[in-house]
Amino acid sequence: MDQQEPSNNVDTSSILSDDGMETQEQSSFVTATIDLTVDDYDETEIQEILDNGKAEEGTDEDSDLVEGILNANSDVQALLDAPSEQVAQALNSFFGNESEQEAVAAQRRVDAEKTAKDEAELKQQEEAEDLIIEDSIVKTDEEKQAVRRLKINEFLSWFTRLLPEQFKNFEFTNPNYLTESISDSPVVNVDKCKEIVKSFKESESLEGLSQKYELIDEDVLVAAICIGVLDTNNEEDVDFNVLCDDRIDDWSIEKCVTFLDYPNTGLNSKNGPLRFMQFTVTSPASAILMLTLIRLREEGHPCRLDFDSNPTDDLLLNFDQVEFSNNIIDTAVKYWDDQKENGAQDKIGRELNDFFHEIESTSAEFKQHFENAVGSRNEIIQLVNEKIPDFDGTEAAVNESFTSDQRTEIINSRAIMETLKAEMKLAIAEAQKVYDTKTDFEKFFVLTVGDFCLARANPSDDAELTYAIVQDRVDAMTYKVKFIDTSQIRECNIRDLAMTTQGMYDPSLNTFGDVGLRVACRQVISSSQFGKKTIWLTGTAAGRRRAHRSDFLIFFDNGTDAYVSAPTMPGEPGYEVASEKKSVFSLKEMIAKMNAAQIAIMVGQPVGKEGNLDYFLTFHWIRQSHRSAYIRDFMKEFPEWPLLKMPVGMRICLYNSLVDRRKKMVTVIGTDRAFAIVRHEAPNPLAPGNRCTDFPCNDRNHQHIDEKIYRGSHRLEGAAHKKHMISTNNNLSQRRKDQLQSQFEPTDMIRSMPERNHQQVVKKKTTGTNQNVASTNDAKSKREIEIRKKNQFLFNKIIVPIPVLTPLENLKAHAQCGPDCLQKMDADPYEARFHRNSPIHTPLLCGWRRIMYTMSTGKKRGAVKKNIIYFSPCGAALHQISDVSEYIHVTRSLLTIDCFSFDARIDTATYITVDDKYLKVADFSLGTEGIPIPLVNSVDNDEPPSLEYSKRRFQYNDQVDISSVSRDFCSGCSCDGDCSDASKCECQQLSIEAMKRLPHNLQFDGHDELVPHYQNRLLSSKVISGLYECNDQCSCHRKSCYNRVVQNNIKYPMHIFKTAQSGWGVRALTDIPQSTFICTYVGAILTDDLADELRNADQYFADLDLKDTVELEKGREDHETDFGYGGDESDYDDEEGSDGDSGDDVMNKMVKRQDSSESGEETKRLTRQKRKQSKKSGKGGSVEKDDTTPRDSMEKDNIESKDEPVFNWDKYFEPFPLYVIDAKQRGNLGRFLNHSCDPNVHVQHVMYDTHDLRLPWVAFFTRKYVKAGDELTWDYQYTQDQTATTQLTCHCGAENCTGRLLKS
């Protein structure tokens, strides 16, 4: 057993402390085996060995391996007679005597106390130097990188100028070592260093280079190579693996980076070069080598280095050396005493002697039995020859011995016997055929005792596989293997075992197929900042090789997907090595073989009834439920599994994993067959390259996190649910299905986004032709477009003045406020004089004061916090919105709660105006909105859009029945005030109860529970289950009610303006707080059937299908809710449980699902299109049976139907139509809101004039703070007909603009 390297445990806190240069005394231990060979020593020599005690420290005797075997020889007696004290003394010579152990333990206690003290002092120092530490905290990544590079250059400059003798004896005890240990020039001339680098590059070895260039030792040689590499930025591309061997590892690199990033380190600080070497446990040459590696990596120069992971390192670093040595000594002494008590004859010797005696006696007995058997055989042969004489007339003798009847019977019996033999042979042949057919595949995947294999001790799909040797086959599902790295023997299931004797190169797989095949793949991952590690992970082959340019598409069990290249045919790289056949492989040869093969075949495979690979059963072999469900769905659709189109520049949300539903925004920067390469957003928006989309990115200063994602993965937000909505029966219209389908279908050409509100363009918008509807824009030069963009922003900002009020200090304080406190300045916020200012500015025109206070936080230099305090007309200070609410209540003010905002970003005084020459219409709403809606055009001379303005929605024609829009279809609340307490308002409780019926994950935004009602007339988050406002049935006060928002008039001033490229838009004329109501979207109410008939004029359609909205949101938030992922059920074959009830538990009325095994029919929702077809064929009320394959039927027979309640939307509304809003000919301000990839407005469904779930109002709320002059936009989520061959480009101008309006 080789001597182990000393383990050095360095306390970071003690090294980085500011006082003291001492380091911990480092202890070492030597593992050795006491091996006294009696044949080589006589009794006297053995006694001398025991008497010698401890050898002199530092001699070669400490590292010698003393070998010996305790046998049954009589000479052992002398050894056994030795007292145990001498034995302990001898053992202590290897592990250190008791006094040394006590000293080490004492020193450790002292060090622990010192460490605690140092940490306390360091904490005090950090508090005293708070500004210094804050500077390091607030630095950007770019600034931190610059500081790190400066430190690296300083340390390299010092280390490379060390005197040659200092490289060998580097214990700097001189306090002036920083100046006295170095020279003015590098230790080796730079030109000479370059020559050394070239020689090293050619030989790839350090051997002989020190003598060739007359260097004192190898450490100076390493330093010279680093100097040469740094001077040329490693143009030679030196392989650092040879240099780092036995010098540094990834642990050293990590320690080095930690030291450099520490704020109080540097060449001239207390934590200088000496502390650096102590902290990283390195010599000067190794320090130069580490700093060189980090500098090359920081600057993006070539740096070839792969650290091999060594699990022994961590084990050695964690050893308690004293405890380890004491345990060995105690065990050895105990064994010594036990042997003496048992007598002189050693137990092992006795057992060996007994064993050999048994062998000898058994051999003699066996020999005698064999001789007796041979003799008996010879006697029997001789007896047969004597008793049975030979004669030729056999048939004649038979004929003479039997009568005619007996002969006939014998002949018949022989005929029957021959017939039976023939039938038996035929049956055996048929049975053999069946056996061969069913077991060829199984025989292919069988391990043999003694074979190498890949196995995992931890039965988890995420765990990696390591090399092992087969010990025994326990049963058909279990093998006993011995792991090579740990020598453990364990029983492993065949789903955790992979073969090394077979691979993808085997011709037999051409017969079995590879789709659904369970495999283990070799993957190289990053194990540290500078190292890589090779592991084997299990997965499923998911695509035919020819469909992916000769690569295998692998779905790994841990949730990732990748292409894996593996040789399958002669001539391909690695084929000869991978396919080599030998009776015996060494471990090294086997590793080389598997590295070439890249893919190993798992022992456990999905075998069907016919004995072949059945990929429909693959999901049974995957333990993780989410991954198993995904594989199940994929194999059912194979090869028709759809891929989401992900063009470069597209932005999409990506889930962390199938289990972790947290989302991150990513940008598509490239594609690779069925994969898209996406770039994650940097946590710091100011980081270098945050908006870079180059792939590959060659800017060394950019820090990117790129990932390859399978375009059919359920980690892509909405992809699984959209595909599910298309492929299953639901209540989506064919028009909506076509829109969803287009996201998975190819498109041919791209066209510009039309001017959505331009009268001439409307007719051409969705015809599906190749005509370029924006040809006029295309014809314009870039200069003209730039001019249009500039003219678009020709507006003025004015400041709305406030009246002069009595100074606050002159107002008298009083205990109780009342109506008189309003100073007769109170007014209705809807008065005409407030139309040209922000509603939040209105209180300031009524005697209120809104004062911003800026205060220092005291945590960081320059960090401030801005607070808003309102002062009422009587001088009362109101610090929060609840104070304002109470004041309005007690004073009975006409001002409403939404006229107040504590958002410090809001500038209440700014108002946007335009020159009179650009004003086309003073009030486009013709007075219907209660506030003027001007229309302006500073871009061109186009006439105002042709639209009949309407504030309320209306029925399209007499065929549309909207009789449910009535107070008779509403329930009201019993509140007698302003409904400010949601817990007491029955209408707000309806909203809360509707939210509670949603799946649990849709009730939260991250870790925050969503609030399903207004808060002070603000909507903090979108409520997909819908909001219930108070209505005509309620007894609350209409104007002051906190739950009446959408039904009120527009409050914030806006105007319609002509944009440069997107037609007419809507601009905010004042600052608008987040969560504020903007306006509604109104138009003609159409039935869904009418909408399908008008599908070519659907550019102004808005679906009122609340259930559809909920289902799509479920798909975006957590698609496994729809598929049954993540539940407690283990029966993944439950087709009805997976598809039949998705999204139907939203509403209150519940029905029970029928048991398909009893009724013989499956309860399936009909699409509106199929319902219409059924009615035409006379089957309007019937329920269609779903087409199932024999496999589906077989699997369903084994599944118990679960009796769970769901709300059946279609049964509830089946006699009644669903509705769509069309604002093409007649509408309101909401019709002019344009699309944006980064919208500041979102849509909310609200019910107040009816509680008919089919007829909610469509309302717009701000999703973030809007500045005066900003355009109000929302995300259309617009998709085109699947038969269309064009795409619309987007000109929203957002930083994250995908460039596409139609998402194909």
Swiss-Prot record:
Catalyzed reactions: N(6)-methyl-L-lysyl(9)-[histone H3] + S-adenosyl-L-methionine = N(6),N(6)-dimethyl-L-lysyl(9)-[histone H3] + S-adenosyl-L-homocysteine + H(+); L-lysyl(9)-[histone H3] + S-adenosyl-L-methionine = N(6)-methyl-L-lysyl(9)-[histone H3] + S-adenosyl-L-homocysteine + H(+)
Amino acids binding S-adenosyl-L-methionine: S1062, G1063, W1064, D1098, Y1100, R1231, N1234, H1235
Region (Disordered): 1-31, 1113-1201
GO cellular component, one term: nucleus
Extent of Basic residues compositional bias: 1166-1178
Gene3D superfamilies: Methyl-cpg-binding Protein 2, Chain A, SET domain
Protein name: Histone-lysine N-methyltransferase met-2
Organism: Caenorhabditis elegans
Species classification: Eukaryota, Metazoa, Ecdysozoa, Nematoda, Chromadorea
